[in-house]
Structure formats: C-alpha cells, structure tokens
C-alpha cells in the first residue's frame, strides 16, 4: 500500500497540478477531499493545456480512478461542462466516482456569495463567487443538500423548497433582490440526475478496499495551507480545511492510512485576492515574477500578487501538515535575476520573529528580514540532475532545505511534464 497526500504549502497556485499529475501516473486512485471548482490547475501535455477545477487529475490516466470525496462541494452544472471538455479530448470520464455525501452548490449559493462579497466593500475577501462559502455554511448549519438527495425526487424537492424559504428572506429583506424560484432550480437539477446516477459510489468504501488491496492512492488537495479555514490568514481564507489532516476526514478514511505527506511550494510565493502578504513585491521584481511565471488565475484570470519566498510561513506549513518532504516548482522563473531574496524572519516592533505569528495584526505590520543570494542566468529547463544546476541555484535550494528541516525531493524546472529534477 502507498498513500500520499499532495497539498499546497502556500496560498495556493503552487503548481500542484503538475505534481499530482506526476504521482497520478502510477496511482490507482486520485482523491479530491475538499473544496470545489474555486481552484484550478493546469496540466501541460505536449502542446495541449488541460485546465481542471473539480475533476481529479487522475482522470487523465486510463488505469486510474478519479474520486470526488465527501469533503468536496460540487457545482453539477460546472462538472457537466468539465466532463464534456474531457470527453471532447477523448479522455474517458466513465470511471469518475462521486461520494453520495458530498454537498451540492445550488444557484442561490452563488448568488449569495456575490452579494455578500459586494456588501463587504473595501474589506472584500476576494472570493471567486462560485458559491463555495455559502454551500459549506449550509453544510455546517445542517441544511445542505447532498449528492444522494438528487436520487430521490421527493426528498430533493422538499429540501430545495425548505431552503428557498429562508434564502428568499435574506435576498428580499437584506439585499433587496428578487426571490429565487424553487421550481426553476428543481427543473435545472433534473438535468443533472444522470451525472449523479452514473457516477455515485460509496467512495469511503472504495478507498478502504483499495487500501486493503495495497493499491496506490493519491489524495489531492486544493488551494493551500495558508488558506485553511482554521490555520490560514483568517478571514482571508477559503471555507474548508486545506491542510493534511482533512485528507482523512474529507475522504472517509482513518489518519493511520496516510504514509506520505508532500507539500508543494513555488520557488517564490504568490497570492490571489486580499489579505496580508509580508514579502509581496509591488515593484519591478513582482512584475517580473508575474510575467515570467504567468501568474494569472486558472479560474478567475486574476493577476496574482507575487513576492520572495517566505521561509517562516513555509516552516509553519511543515508543522501544520507534518510534511514528510517538499516539492519546489517554478525554479526556472528565477533564472535571470541578479539577486534573489529569501525571507528568514520578520521584524515587528524592534523584535526579530522566527516563528510564524498567531496574532493577525502582526501579519499587516511586520517587515521581512531577508538573506540575499546571487542569482543565475542559465536556462535550467533541460536540467535533470541537481548537481547540474548552477551553483547559485543549488545554494538557494540547500538553504531552504536546511531552514525548514524537511528534504526537498523534487524540483520543477519548467512547465512540461518531463521538466523535473528528482532528488
């Protein structure tokens, strides 16, 4: 048996798609355990770029079963489109397994998400307005609608009509918007019933049986650790637990079944939307990283904020997730920079902080303390061995590894599937 969790060690967009694709090539199951279509990753296959937001990356491999587990929230309209896109590329989607206990994103969730975000004005969270937060809120309030509900017309209609009553009070009384119509939602979701009936499986049992049969399982996280609802830069976080502990909870397996926890980080750091960002570069360095790194959101197309790699937050991610190793992506983006900085501490009120601060206000006021390295000019995209990297690049990687006290076992030096260094 081999079970591996792959997750982001930053604010998402770390290049997890390429890493999960690397693992998926030998996996029997690839399991999404949280989130919805609010995060995306792009997998480059030759000249083709395949952008996935909800379907696990294992769908690209004929011998792998992609699983959307109970910790996820599902926009069935979006899923239908994504499956159609894959089918048009002659990719088999019949093997997709969907948990009956995953919650459904309803049209009113997306409407509420947009209205709530707009009402925050300058204090906007930066949500993708996909309905993720309101869907998880309904789940916690025990009024959510699950995948299995769609298989029973009477149950589904009853739950929709019950939820609509409260939702319409919010829409009409608070936001002064017209009410939504239950019958229209019911009719829309009748068109999605085939998706559910064709793919619904007891995914917890499916994973358990795979473990008993010593199969290889990959648990694929979305977003990143610093967006975790409990451990991230609250309130500028997502609505689910993105850290490693949720791989077990969101999939319906026990934590003792997890063998390996891989964190993914870029050689620098980026963030989408609002929230504190201590090493952000609002200058030509930031512009350089954005342009060379193609730092624009897969889902939203938004320009990402970029900055130097923050080892304090990275070491925090190591702790929160019990990372067994670290994968670094986009090292090639740093090629061409004369000097490169690594954040090794925070300065706050004349005090040097070397542990990640729990106090929210510190993240807005702290200043980064940098260690500066000489850069390199060589094109490293064809490099296959660590020893063949420029000496300055080797020093940069070794410094990161020594600071976080976790081995770096994989370095991506280009966007292609094969442009990697395995250590």
Predicted regions located by residue number:
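Non-transmembrane, aqueous-exposed alpha-helical and coiled segments at domain scale
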Residues: 1-423
């Amino acid at each position: 048996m081999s079970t591996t969790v792959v997750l982001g060690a930053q604010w998402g967009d770390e290049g997890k798609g390429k890493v999960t694709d690397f693992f998926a090539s030998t996996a029997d199951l690839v399991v999404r355990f949280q989130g919805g279509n609010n995060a995306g990753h792009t997998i480059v296959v030759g000249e083709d770029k395949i952008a996935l937001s909800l379907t696990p990356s294992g769908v690209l491999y004929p011998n792998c079963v992609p699983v959307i587990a109970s910790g996820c929230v599902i926009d069935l309209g979006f899923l239908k489109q994504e499956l159609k896109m894959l089918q048009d590329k002659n990719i088999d989607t019949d093997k997709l397994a969907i948990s009956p206990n995953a919650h459904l994103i309803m049209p009113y969730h997306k409407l509420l998400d947009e209205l709530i975000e707009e009402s925050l004005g300058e204090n906007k969270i930066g949500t993708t307005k996909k309905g993720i937060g309101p869907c998880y809120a309904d789940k916690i309030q025990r009024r959510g609608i699950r995948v299995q509900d769609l298989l029973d017309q009477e149950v589904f209609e009853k739950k929709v009509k019950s939820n609509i009553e409260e939702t319409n009070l919010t829409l009409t009384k608070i936001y002064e918007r017209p009410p939504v119509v239950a019958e229209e939602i019911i009719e829309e979701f009748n068109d999605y019933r085939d998706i559910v009936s064709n793919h619904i499986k007891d995914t917890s049992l499916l994973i358990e049986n795979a473990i008993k049969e010593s199969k290889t399982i990959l648990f694929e996280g979305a977003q990143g650790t610093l967006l975790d609802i409990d451990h991230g830069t609250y309130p500028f976080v997502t609505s689910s637990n993105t850290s490693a502990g949720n791989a077990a909870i969101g999939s319906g397996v026990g934590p003792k079944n997890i063998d390996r926890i891989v964190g993914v980080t870029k050689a620098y750091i980026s963030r989408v939307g609002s929230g504190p960002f201590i090493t952000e570069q609002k200058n030509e360095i930031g512009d350089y990283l954005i342009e060379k790194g193609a730092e624009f959101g897969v889902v939203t197309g938004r320009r990402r904020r970029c900055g130097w790699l923050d080892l304090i937050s990275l070491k925090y991610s190591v702790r929160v997730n019990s990372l067994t190793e670290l994968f670094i992506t986009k090292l090639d983006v740093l090629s061409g920079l004369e000097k490169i900085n690594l954040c090794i501490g925070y300065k706050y009120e004349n005090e040097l902080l070397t542990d990640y601060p729990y106090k929210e206000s510190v993240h807005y006021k702290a200043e980064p303390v940098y260690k500066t390295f000489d850069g390199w000019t060589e094109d490293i995209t064809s490099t296959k061995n660590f020893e063949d990297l420029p000496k300055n690049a080797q020093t940069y990687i070794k410094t990161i590894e020594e600071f976080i006290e976790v081995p770096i076992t994989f370095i991506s030096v280009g966007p292609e599937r094969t442009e990697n260094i395995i250590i």
